[in-house]
Design a protein with these regions (language model features):
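Small-residue-enriched hydrophobic alpha-helices in membranes
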Residues: 580-756
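Catalytic-loop region of hydrolases
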Residues: 16-94
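Short beta-strand/loop motif that positions the catalytic acidic residue
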Residues: 331-333, 337
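Conserved acidic catalytic loop of the alpha/beta-hydrolase fold
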Residues: 141-143, 152-170
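Short, surface-exposed "cap/lid" segments of acyl-processing enzymes
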Residues: 58-60, 64-140
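Gly/Ala-rich beta-loop-alpha elbow adjacent to hydrolase catalytic centers
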Residues: 174-179, 183
Length: 756
């Protein structure tokens, strides 16, 4: 080895262990990235202040026109009704039923239902429907109550109906998250105002859940009930800070709250800022509720769980009974939603009904759709969900309204382009509504009697603690909890403080904006294969995993403590729950007025069992054939629509829907007599009966019959219809083929995209 070579070898050996270039590149990037991150935080704070300064802040991506101001009602509230202005180029048909979207008042401001162009509002516009939006102002009207809001929302729907006198149906109503239970309360009190109701990610049965999951339902028990809600309302000088509700959501996922969300921005700071700021505009727009409103929500819903058993009583002494709803109810939830898991969205049916026959006896149509993987917010804001589930609901709203009473699951499968019935499918998916039973609901998870008793113990303890608070503590809190103190408490809230800290008023951040401009002009991003960058990424994943593990461990601890405390026989006996082994919650009975209505309806259907002509006979026959398969889809509905237009154009869509439901109920009442009456109904109009025979066969060819019972029924019905076909006289010596030629449905407006 020469003297010239010897120095170079140790130097070469040191290079892999001292990657100075990589280190320098990493630290330059980290310094620049830190400045850009601080600049985004400052932009977030500026956006927060600008948003809060608006008289009616919202995050809608559409223009609006004020229709009604709830503050001007006899019982004023801070809710408003606006008409959404359709984007240019979209044709809106005012004769189509309007869609009304109700936004959740759960700590955030309004607008999440129209947060993106591809949203619930967007897909309703694409289907050609007028759209309205019910939002709210950040400050409540002094003294407003939940009952006042229910009355105001009913008044809003009355106005929408009045604005569309020629619409082909009552408004379709969407209630997102916490707006879902409010919409259901309005529908129970004023069922005549509603078309189909879609409740998306909405909790309706608050105790329901699965062991090992759904920890949020235990929170009220560990806090000793709703006395803390009352304390927060008193400290807020009669107003409850919605930021506390948002903090409950954030506590569910400590990994995302304390690390992932901010690290994702830091690691993608060059591209992620617009998306981050867009979401933070809504997430940081905290609002206020009256203390009385929040106390009602906590006592009657979250802890009391009274909505699903008709336990809520209004000031006029009437129960809010969800069985009073006459419109179809569509429940949309997700298995990945840890805020409103499927049991909390669906188990209200188990609370109210013994069986599907009980649902039918109340004339109700309930549909559910369960997503496999989307989170809570994704139900409202995900573009993929909007393009699939919400689009199909909007496109098939008329089929949903014509479905016979019962319980169904909406099953969506990709459209087969090569299928001979592809022209009958309006969107990218074929929607099938498959009959289900309450056992299918139980399969998602439900409480045992022991579980119910534990939550009932929480409700009793909550009442005791609330009484003690109001007797011994509240008189000492209220005198010093003035408006000024309440405002400072809100500013110092852990969720609001980060927005307040990074404002331009902070002297430590005066130069951040100019530094960020300089960095953008001289940006030196690190290479993705940089060793230190990759180590940072691995460290980030490790921190995220650790926080997830902490969250899982915390949830298991919370659950075990809850069951240990409230499962105690001694505690349950002290609060009066051991006096009986029966379930602490009882299914509500049926009042005498409704029993009389049902008796009258049965008498009417029995009397008219042989009434009608070939149209009624064809619908009755189709239902009779298809009932064993338990499936309805949009292809059959389009053909039924075609039948209505071809053979009875004078029959309105509403009358047609009523006819379908009446024929289904007639079959349920006395199936054999109903079928035996078909020949006489066909004889009323022989020529029309002949056309109906062709139509019925075409329907069955398109839809198919899967079960042996259905095939046997088809043979029975075919014999009835074929024996009454009138031979058609040939024109120009050539026989004419009777065949329905369905038109290809247009995407917008989607008047022709009905299902069935």
């Amino acid at each position: 080895m020469t003297s010239q070579e010897s120095p170079s070898k140790p130097q070469a050996a040191l290079v892999p262990f001292f990657p100075w270039k990589d280190a320098w590149s990493y630290w330059v990037d980290a310094s620049q990235r830190g400045v850009l991150f601080l600049d985004v935080m400052q932009q977030r704070s500026e956006q927060y202040e600008e948003h809060a300064a608006k008289p009616a802040p919202h995050v809608l991506k559409f223009g609006t026109e004020l229709v009604m101001d709830g503050r001007k009602l006899a019982r004023p509230v801070n809710y408003i009704l606006v008409r959404i202005v359709a984007p240019k180029g979209l044709e809106i048909n005012d004769k189509k039923r309007p869609f009304v979207i109700f936004d959740p008042r759960a700590g955030h401001g309004p607008g999440i239902g129209g947060f993106k162009a591809q949203s619930e509002i967007g897909v309703a516009f694409q289907a050609g429907h007028p759209c309205y939006f019910v939002g709210f102002l950040p400050e409540p009207v002094s003294g407003q109550t939940i009952e006042d809001i229910v009355m105001a929302e009913a008044a809003f729907l009355e106005r929408v109906i009045a604005l569309h006198p020629e619409a082909d149906g009552k408004p379709a109503v969407i209630g997102n998250c916490q707006a879902g239970w409010a919409v259901m309360m309005v529908a129970a009190k004023r069922p005549e105002l509603f078309g189909p109701i879609i409740v998306a990610g909405s909790p309706l049965s608050y105790w329901a859940g699965v062991h090992g999951e759904n920890p949020m339902r235990y929170t009220g028990g560990l806090l000793g009930g709703t006395w803390l809600t009352a304390l927060m309302g008193d400290i807020g000088a009669g107003k409850f800070d919605g930021a506390w509700l948002v903090s409950n959501f954030e506590n569910l996922n400590p990994a995302n709250t304390y690390w992932t969300k901010q690290y994702n921005l830091y690691s993608k700071v060059d591209t992620e800022a617009p998306r981050y700021l867009e979401f933070e505009k809504w997430w940081g727009g905290h609002i206020l509720l009256n203390a009385e409103e929040m106390q009602f929500i906590a006592d009657e819903l979250f802890i009391g769980n009274k909505l699903s058993t008709a336990g809520i009583v209004t000031s006029d002494g009437q129960s809010v009974d969800l069985r009073s709803i006459r419109s179809p109810i569509i429940v949309f939830c997700s298995k990945a939603d840890n805020i409103t898991p499927p049991p909390q969205a669906l188990d209200w049916m188990l609370d109210l009904y013994d069986s599907v026959e009980d649902i039918r006896a109340h004339g109700q149509t309930i549909i559910y759709a369960v997503h496999e993987s989307i989170g809570h917010l994704g139900i409202f804001v995900s573009g993929s969900v909007a393009k699939k589930e919400h689009d199909e609901f909007a496109s098939n709203i008329d089929l949903i309204e014509v479905l016979p009473p019962g319980l169904y699951e909406a099953v969506m499968t990709p459209k087969e382009e090569g299928s001979p019935t592809a022209d009958l499918v309006g969107g990218d998916y074929l929607v099938r509504f498959e009959a289900r039973t309450l056992d299918d609901i139980r399969a998602f998870g439900c409480n045992s009697v022991d579980d119910e008793r534990k939550f009932a113990a929480v409700a009793r303890i909550s009442e005791i603690n609330l009484g003690l608070y109001r007797t011994f503590v509240q008189p000492w809190v209220k005198p010093w909890a003035n408006a000024g103190f309440a405002e400072w408490m809100r500013k110092l809230h852990p969720l609001r403080l980060p927005y307040e800290m990074f404002t331009p008023a902070n002297p430590l951040l005066k130069s951040v904006s100019s530094m960020a401009d300089y960095v953008r002009e001289n940006r030196q991003p690190v290479s993705p294969d940089n060793a230190l960058w990759q180590a940072q990424h691995r460290m980030g994943k490790a921190i995220e995993s650790s926080l997830k593990a902490y969250g899982d461990m915390r949830d298991r601890f919370v659950e075990s403590v809850f069951h240990a405390v409230y499962g105690s026989p001694v505690l349950q006996a002290v609060v009066g729950l051991k006096a009986s082994d029966a379930s602490p919650r009882h299914r509500p009975g049926v009042d005498a007025v409704y029993r009389a209505f049902v008796a009258h309806r049965i008498e009417e259907l029995t009397r008219n069992i042989a009434q009608g002509g070939p149209r009624e006979a064809a619908i009755r026959a189709l239902l009779y054939i298809r009932i064993p398969d338990g499936v309805a889809d949009e292809r059959g509905f389009r053909l039924l629509e075609h039948m209505r237009e071809e053979t009875g154009g004078e029959l309105s869509l509403a009358a047609f829907k009523a006819m379908v439901r009446d024929q289904f109920l007639t079959l349920l009442l006395d199936e054999r007599r109903a079928i035996e009456a078909i020949p006489a109904m066909l004889d009323a109009e022989p020529e029309l009966a002949s056309r109906m025979a062709v139509t019925l066969r075409k329907l069955i060819e398109v839809l198919g019959v899967e079960s042996k019972v259905g095939k046997a029924r088809f043979a029975e019905i075919a014999a009835m219809f074929e024996s009454r076909k009138v031979p058609k006289a040939p024109k120009n010596g050539a026989p004419k083929e009777d065949r329905i030629q369905p038109a290809r449905p247009a995407r917008a407006p989607a008047a022709s995209r009905n299902l069935s």
